[in-house]
Swiss-Prot record:
Primary subcellular site in the record, as a coarse category: mitochondrion
Mitochondrion keyword on record: yes
Family annotation (Gene3D superfamilies): Tetracycline Repressor, domain 2
GO terms for biological process, alphabetical: ubiquinone biosynthetic process
Binding site for a 1,2-diacylglycero-3-phosphoethanolamine: 241-244
Pfam family, one: COQ9
GO cellular component, one term: mitochondrial inner membrane
Subcellular location(s) of the protein: Mitochondrion
Function text: Membrane-associated protein that warps the membrane surface to access and bind aromatic isoprenes with high specificity, including ubiquinone (CoQ) isoprene intermediates and presents them directly to coq7, therefore facilitating the coq7-mediated hydroxylase step. Participates in the biosynthesis of coenzyme Q, also named ubiquinone, an essential lipid-soluble electron transporter for aerobic cellular respiration.
Name of the featured protein: Probable ubiquinone biosynthesis protein coq9, mitochondrial
GO molecular function, one term: lipid binding
Span of the signal peptide: none
Gene from which the chain derives: coq9
Composition bias, Low complexity: 76-92
């Protein structure tokens, strides 16, 4: 009788031990069942079984406690790890930027052989002692990044040349009219692409690609804005936008003309720039004359009405 009861209890408590969310302790029940049956062999076997259940139930944690223990372990590991100082983070970023610039600058040597392509960047990485996969640091399209780097570098170099008071170009610039200053600035900027003129159409395609145009536009806007600034233009409102839009169109057309120019030292391109700048200044002057004429006429008309 007691044996049957204990067998059923054994099964029930085993299931309880495995499914419970807390530790299960069956010691109390075990003691109460065996108080008056110490001489029974069957009871002894059952007692051993309960001892096993008691050991199992008091040594195996449930799933929730495992998760809590793991979270506590992760928290302790995070506390032990030293936090990166802002200075260390800044140095890491600066080192990464320097590496990008070195790779891109070195890649320019391979443009004439491999074009504005990822292959040119790979060759540069290999020469520097890095595997070709290192170009991934530049982004998804290393060829585009190379073209964008070059035009940005050229814009910066132009600004430095025309802003340096000790530079010979600055001395020439100071003695020129606004029209001649614009011509000189455009010619200096166009001359910077001469070393890559045979491959420049590839760069233009990359920069004008619809997926890249958003990132490419600021470089062109910076170029024309710098030129008008160096010329001394102080226009505002609509004039500011009109002049920059016209100069962008002029420079782009000059680049396209230069691609097919076979004249000595691109003399035809420089003549093209001279003619287009003359037209640009005439257009701006004509626009200003029209505005002035309309203003005078309107003012005269209003004065007559008041009388």
């Amino acid at each position: 009788m007691i044996s049957n009861i204990l067998k059923k209890s054994n099964s029930l408590f085993l299931r309880s031990t495995l499914s419970s969310n807390k530790f299960t302790n069956v010691t109390i029940l075990r003691n109460s069942l065996f108080l008056n049956n110490n001489n029974n062999d069957n009871n002894t076997n059952i007692k051993q079984t309960y001892n096993k259940i008691n050991f199992f139930s008091t040594t195996v944690p449930n799933q929730n406690e495992k998760i809590e223990l793991k979270q506590e372990q992760i928290k302790q590991e995070q506390q032990q790890q030293p936090e990166q100082q802002p200075e260390q983070q800044t140095n890491k970023i600066n080192n990464e930027i320097e590496l990008k610039i070195k790779i891109l600058e070195n890649s320019l040597k391979y443009v004439n052989s491999y074009g504005w392509t990822s292959e040119a960047v790979s060759k540069a990485c290999i020469e520097m002692g890095y595997p070709p996969i290192t170009q991934g640091i530049l982004g998804e399209d290393s060829a585009y990044e190379l073209a964008l780097y070059f035009v940005t570098k050229c814009n910066t170099d132009l600004m430095i040349k025309l802003s340096d008071a000790e530079n010979s170009e600055q001395q020439l610039l100071s003695g020129l009219s606004k029209k001649e200053k614009v011509k000189l600035a455009l010619k200096l900027r166009l001359s910077m692409i001469k070393p890559f003129i045979g491959r420049w159409s590839e760069a233009m395609q990359l920069l004008a690609n619809p997926k890249n145009i958003v990132n490419s536009s600021p470089s062109m806007l910076t170029l024309v804005d710098n030129i008008w600034y160096l010329v001394g233009d102080k226009s505002s409102d609509f004039d500011w936008y009109a002049k920059r839009g016209l100069l962008i169109a002029l420079y782009t057309s000059a680049e396209l003309f230069m691609l097919s120019d076979t004249s000595v030292d691109h003399s035809n391109t420089w003549r093209f720039v001279d003619d287009r700048v003359d037209d640009l200044i005439k257009t701006i002057k004509f626009k200003n004359d029209i505005e002035e004429t309309v203003g005078i006429t309107l003012n005269t008309f209003l004065q007559k009405i008041k009388k």
